[in-house]
Amino acid sequence: MARESGTVLDNVRRIQPGDMSSFFCTGGTTGLPKIAMRSHGNEVANAWSAGRFFGDSIGPGKTTFCGLPLFHVNAAMVTGLLPFSRGAHVVLGTPQGYRGDGVVKRFWEIVEHHHINFFSGVPTLYASLLDIPADGHVIDSLEYGLCGAAPMPVGVFRAFQEKTGIRILEGYGLTEGTCVSSVNPPTGERRLGSIGLRIPFQAMKAVIVDDAGRYLRDCAANEEGLLVISGPNVFTGYLRADQNNALWLDLGDGKRWFNTGDLGRCDVDGYFWLTGRKKELIIRGGHNIDPAAIEEPLHRHPAVQLAAAIGRPDAHAGELPVAYVQLKPGMGATEHDLTAFMQQEIAERAALPKHVRIVEAIPLTGVGKIFKPELKRRETRDALRAALAQGGAPGASIDVTTDQSGGMSVSVELSEPGLEPAARVVLGRFPFAFSISIAAQPTRSS
């Protein structure tokens, strides 16, 4: 204590903007997580820019609820460094966040007790809160909630605002962009379904690229393209050097533009709209199907709590759309009911799911995002098993794995060597790397 000046800490360490501050795993919804390296400069810049955007909505006298787990950038930044840097209070909702025992069930009680003004969550949280009555709790301190990490179904968006009266600010960001890149303004016009306006000093645009991923031109207003970002918040790169290929686009302006892998458009007023993820597109016989074209209508069904659309491998069409559905507690619907509903709601015939699968629980990541790779692996195993049986190689044991790039590889174990020629013919019709082995034969005793 004696060596300190009395007004500031005399820290021997001098932190530079380029020094590494954190190593965060990416969300991992399209494959295995990668470790993103972010500098002190990245995080300070993002907190400052977001703070300027939110203004007095987050500041002295305000209380933020941190409900996402602390290993997630939203918790560390939006409900962490951002409110701390603005002089706001932060209430931690257990180290496990919303997954902590009783946190969601007692959410409205927590809001009332701590006079929460702001919270942040993923779409699955808002869907869960719709099933928790707020009756009897005084929650008028709550000004708005932020939604990011995954697109918010419009049906959930409307239902939550109508039921609670709480404004939702939908935003967009990535671990690679520190956290926040765009968000609907807290005091300006909020556009339903939009991911909002870019925050200060965040360069962001939609661009057209060729088949090799090279930049061709900027998109016109409302033209869909690949979203790219540049600015002081954009990370250094991934820890593993081999994962840094094709991260950056050269737009000819000397800036480092990060390829987000997301598809979107920017309207004439500067509001961005997320239209899908390039890697999640379902390609059925040449038709590019955005999973949202299936998921949005399903979320409008009164019995549906969560829905996820993926592509099922098909030797003829490439992929066939399949919908997974998790029903609301106490609600009932059959696959036939949901199929009939979608026939009325989905105009694009190619987008109608070939199958609807009602499951007890859709797999989620640690922060509550729908984890589609698990569903994709499940469909791939089922499709290949059926194709092998039809092609003369029944009873195969199939293991599907996902590599760092999100690609799949298949290991097939056959019951006898004579099935291998037929199996190779069948597997050769699918765009997967595969290996074939023969199950060990039991030793016969004489």
What spans do the regions from the language model cover?
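Short hydrophobic/charged patches on amphipathic alpha-helices used for structural packing
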Residues: 12, 104-108, 136, 295
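Glycine-centered tight turns that cap/initiate beta-strands
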Residues: 19, 141, 165, 201, ...
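Conserved AMP-binding/adenylate-forming
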Residues: 93, 144-148, 152-171, 175-272, ...
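AMP-binding/adenylate-forming catalytic core of the ANL superfamily
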Residues: 112, 119, 231, 236-237, ...
